């Protein structure tokens, strides 16, 4: 299972809000919802997030085993 929990933690730690992601990073509100609900997000969007914040993919996404 894919989880964006690492990025949600990063957002809290760095005081990043929804409006910043939409307006400064350029992601859509639909993508923001997907990130919060651990739904699939396109790889080019994940790359955009990594490049904007200068963070490795491991700070955006993690894979958890399904139980």
Please identify what each model-predicted range represents.
Residues 12, 23, 51:
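Alpha-helical residues within the helix-turn-helix
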Residues 54-67:
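Short C-terminal boundary/hinge segments that cap the last helix of small helical domains
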